A protein has these predicted regions:
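A charged alpha-helical hairpin associated with nucleic-acid processing machineries
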Residues: 21-37, 41-209
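Short hydrophobic/aromatic-enriched beta-strand-loop microsegments
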Residues: 12-19
Protein backbone atom coordinates (compact mmCIF):
# COMPACT_ATOMS: atom_id res chain seq x y z
CA UNK A 1 0.00 0.00 0.00
CA UNK A 2 1.23 3.47 -0.89
CA UNK A 3 1.08 4.99 2.58
CA UNK A 4 3.07 2.08 4.01
CA UNK A 5 5.70 2.47 1.30
CA UNK A 6 5.98 6.17 2.12
CA UNK A 7 6.43 5.50 5.83
CA UNK A 8 9.04 2.82 5.13
CA UNK A 9 10.91 5.38 3.01
CA UNK A 10 10.95 7.83 5.90
CA UNK A 11 7.97 10.03 5.05
CA UNK A 12 6.36 9.76 8.46
CA UNK A 13 3.67 12.36 7.84
CA UNK A 14 2.01 10.41 5.04
CA UNK A 15 -1.66 9.70 5.59
CA UNK A 16 -4.42 8.11 3.53
CA UNK A 17 -8.17 8.39 3.23
CA UNK A 18 -8.46 4.59 3.38
CA UNK A 19 -10.10 3.98 0.04
CA UNK A 20 -12.93 6.45 0.54
CA UNK A 21 -13.44 9.79 -1.14
CA UNK A 22 -11.83 12.69 0.68
CA UNK A 23 -14.50 14.52 2.67
CA UNK A 24 -14.79 17.89 4.37
CA UNK A 25 -14.51 15.96 7.62
CA UNK A 26 -11.14 14.56 6.57
CA UNK A 27 -10.02 18.04 5.54
CA UNK A 28 -11.06 19.53 8.87
CA UNK A 29 -9.12 16.83 10.68
CA UNK A 30 -6.02 17.52 8.59
CA UNK A 31 -6.34 21.22 9.34
CA UNK A 32 -5.75 20.47 13.02
CA UNK A 33 -2.24 19.31 12.17
CA UNK A 34 -1.10 21.26 9.13
CA UNK A 35 -1.68 24.23 6.86
CA UNK A 36 -0.20 22.55 3.79
CA UNK A 37 -0.89 19.21 2.10
CA UNK A 38 1.00 17.53 -0.73
CA UNK A 39 -1.26 15.32 -2.83
CA UNK A 40 0.30 12.16 -4.17
CA UNK A 41 -2.57 10.38 -5.88
CA UNK A 42 -2.00 7.84 -8.63
CA UNK A 43 -0.83 9.47 -11.86
CA UNK A 44 -3.56 7.82 -13.97
CA UNK A 45 -6.91 9.34 -14.89
CA UNK A 46 -8.60 8.24 -11.69
CA UNK A 47 -5.83 9.77 -9.60
CA UNK A 48 -6.01 13.07 -11.48
CA UNK A 49 -9.78 13.12 -10.96
CA UNK A 50 -9.30 12.45 -7.25
CA UNK A 51 -6.78 15.28 -6.95
CA UNK A 52 -9.09 17.71 -8.75
CA UNK A 53 -11.85 16.79 -6.33
CA UNK A 54 -9.65 17.08 -3.24
CA UNK A 55 -8.19 20.52 -4.00
CA UNK A 56 -11.36 22.61 -3.40
CA UNK A 57 -12.28 20.54 -0.34
CA UNK A 58 -8.91 21.28 1.23
CA UNK A 59 -9.03 24.93 0.18
CA UNK A 60 -12.40 25.32 1.87
CA UNK A 61 -10.82 24.66 5.28
CA UNK A 62 -7.82 26.88 4.58
CA UNK A 63 -5.25 24.27 3.55
CA UNK A 64 -2.72 25.15 0.86
CA UNK A 65 -2.33 22.26 -1.57
CA UNK A 66 0.41 21.15 -3.93
CA UNK A 67 0.45 18.17 -6.28
CA UNK A 68 3.39 15.78 -6.60
CA UNK A 69 4.22 14.57 -10.10
CA UNK A 70 5.11 10.86 -10.03
CA UNK A 71 5.31 10.20 -13.74
CA UNK A 72 6.31 7.98 -15.37
CA UNK A 73 5.31 5.83 -12.38
CA UNK A 74 1.75 5.23 -11.27
CA UNK A 75 1.97 5.57 -7.50
CA UNK A 76 4.39 6.31 -4.63
CA UNK A 77 5.17 2.64 -4.10
CA UNK A 78 6.28 2.14 -7.72
CA UNK A 79 8.14 5.45 -7.75
CA UNK A 80 10.16 4.79 -4.59
CA UNK A 81 11.01 1.23 -5.63
CA UNK A 82 12.32 2.52 -8.96
CA UNK A 83 14.02 5.80 -8.03
CA UNK A 84 14.33 5.82 -4.26
CA UNK A 85 13.29 8.10 -1.40
CA UNK A 86 15.76 10.87 -2.25
CA UNK A 87 14.29 11.36 -5.71
CA UNK A 88 10.81 11.36 -4.19
CA UNK A 89 11.94 14.13 -1.84
CA UNK A 90 13.03 16.08 -4.92
CA UNK A 91 9.58 15.63 -6.43
CA UNK A 92 8.09 17.02 -3.21
CA UNK A 93 10.28 20.11 -3.53
CA UNK A 94 9.08 20.56 -7.11
CA UNK A 95 5.41 19.88 -6.35
CA UNK A 96 3.02 21.90 -8.50
CA UNK A 97 0.81 24.67 -7.18
CA UNK A 98 -2.73 23.27 -7.07
CA UNK A 99 -4.26 26.11 -9.10
CA UNK A 100 -1.66 25.76 -11.84
CA UNK A 101 -2.25 21.99 -11.77
CA UNK A 102 -5.96 22.57 -12.35
CA UNK A 103 -5.26 24.91 -15.26
CA UNK A 104 -2.80 22.45 -16.84
CA UNK A 105 -5.30 19.59 -16.64
CA UNK A 106 -8.05 21.83 -17.99
CA UNK A 107 -5.89 22.79 -20.99
CA UNK A 108 -5.87 19.18 -22.17
CA UNK A 109 -9.53 19.58 -23.12
CA UNK A 110 -8.82 22.37 -25.60
CA UNK A 111 -7.21 22.50 -29.03
CA UNK A 112 -4.65 25.28 -28.65
CA UNK A 113 -4.14 25.38 -32.43
CA UNK A 114 -7.77 26.37 -32.95
CA UNK A 115 -8.49 30.07 -32.26
CA UNK A 116 -12.03 29.45 -31.01
CA UNK A 117 -10.96 26.66 -28.67
CA UNK A 118 -8.01 28.72 -27.46
CA UNK A 119 -10.29 31.66 -26.67
CA UNK A 120 -12.65 29.36 -24.79
CA UNK A 121 -9.69 28.12 -22.72
CA UNK A 122 -8.70 31.68 -21.84
CA UNK A 123 -12.26 32.42 -20.79
CA UNK A 124 -12.27 29.40 -18.50
CA UNK A 125 -8.99 30.56 -16.97
CA UNK A 126 -10.54 33.96 -16.30
CA UNK A 127 -13.53 32.33 -14.60
CA UNK A 128 -11.23 30.36 -12.32
CA UNK A 129 -9.21 33.46 -11.48
CA UNK A 130 -12.42 35.04 -10.22
CA UNK A 131 -12.30 32.48 -7.42
CA UNK A 132 -9.61 34.60 -5.76
CA UNK A 133 -11.53 37.28 -3.90
CA UNK A 134 -8.44 39.12 -2.65
CA UNK A 135 -7.10 41.46 -5.31
CA UNK A 136 -3.40 40.89 -4.62
CA UNK A 137 -3.73 37.10 -4.74
CA UNK A 138 -5.76 37.29 -7.93
CA UNK A 139 -3.17 39.58 -9.50
CA UNK A 140 -0.34 37.21 -8.55
CA UNK A 141 -2.12 34.24 -10.11
CA UNK A 142 -3.02 36.25 -13.19
CA UNK A 143 0.67 37.02 -13.61
CA UNK A 144 1.62 33.37 -13.12
CA UNK A 145 -0.89 32.16 -15.71
CA UNK A 146 0.17 34.91 -18.11
CA UNK A 147 3.79 33.76 -17.91
CA UNK A 148 3.03 30.04 -18.11
CA UNK A 149 0.70 30.23 -21.12
CA UNK A 150 2.20 33.26 -22.89
CA UNK A 151 -0.99 35.30 -22.55
CA UNK A 152 -0.40 39.07 -22.53
CA UNK A 153 -0.93 40.11 -18.92
CA UNK A 154 -3.02 43.18 -19.72
CA UNK A 155 -5.32 41.16 -22.00
CA UNK A 156 -5.90 38.53 -19.33
CA UNK A 157 -6.37 41.16 -16.64
CA UNK A 158 -8.97 42.97 -18.75
CA UNK A 159 -10.80 39.70 -19.42
CA UNK A 160 -10.92 38.88 -15.71
CA UNK A 161 -12.06 42.39 -14.83
CA UNK A 162 -14.75 42.30 -17.51
CA UNK A 163 -16.15 39.06 -16.13
CA UNK A 164 -15.95 40.41 -12.60
CA UNK A 165 -17.86 43.57 -13.50
CA UNK A 166 -20.54 41.67 -15.42
CA UNK A 167 -21.05 39.22 -12.60
CA UNK A 168 -20.70 41.73 -9.80
CA UNK A 169 -18.35 39.28 -8.14
CA UNK A 170 -15.19 41.06 -7.10
CA UNK A 171 -13.34 44.33 -7.29
CA UNK A 172 -11.43 44.77 -10.58
CA UNK A 173 -7.68 44.36 -10.57
CA UNK A 174 -5.51 47.44 -10.75
CA UNK A 175 -2.96 47.66 -13.52
CA UNK A 176 0.59 46.80 -12.53
CA UNK A 177 3.21 49.49 -12.91
CA UNK A 178 5.70 48.72 -15.66
CA UNK A 179 9.09 47.46 -14.59
CA UNK A 180 7.86 45.94 -11.33
CA UNK A 181 7.92 42.19 -11.03
CA UNK A 182 6.55 40.18 -8.15
CA UNK A 183 9.18 37.86 -6.69
CA UNK A 184 8.16 34.35 -5.86
CA UNK A 185 8.22 33.69 -2.17
CA UNK A 186 10.55 30.85 -1.31
CA UNK A 187 9.74 28.36 1.35
CA UNK A 188 12.10 29.09 4.22
CA UNK A 189 12.58 26.66 7.07
CA UNK A 190 9.17 25.05 6.88
CA UNK A 191 8.72 22.67 9.76
CA UNK A 192 8.07 19.07 8.92
CA UNK A 193 4.94 19.17 11.04
CA UNK A 194 3.47 21.64 8.56
CA UNK A 195 3.75 19.15 5.73
CA UNK A 196 1.53 16.17 5.10
CA UNK A 197 1.54 13.81 2.18
CA UNK A 198 -1.99 12.76 1.38
CA UNK A 199 -2.09 9.54 -0.58
CA UNK A 200 -5.14 7.96 -2.09
CA UNK A 201 -5.54 4.22 -1.55
CA UNK A 202 -7.64 3.59 -4.62
CA UNK A 203 -10.37 0.95 -4.59
CA UNK A 204 -9.25 -1.43 -7.34
CA UNK A 205 -12.78 -2.32 -8.38
CA UNK A 206 -13.69 1.29 -9.02
CA UNK A 207 -10.56 3.04 -10.16
CA UNK A 208 -7.94 0.70 -11.55
CA UNK A 209 -7.48 1.35 -15.24
CA UNK A 210 -8.16 -1.67 -17.45
CA UNK A 211 -5.00 -3.38 -18.62
Amino acid sequence: MDVIALHQAGFDNAVASLGTALTSGHASLLKRYTNEVYLTYDSDGAGVKAALRAIPILKEVGITTKVINMRPYKDPDEFIKALGAQEYEERIKKAENSFMFQIRIMQAGYDMDDPESKTAFYNEIAKKLLGFTEELERTNYTQAVSREYSIPYDDLRKLVNSMAMKGGIVKPQTKLKSGINEKNKKEDGMKQSQKLLLTWLIDCLLYTSPS
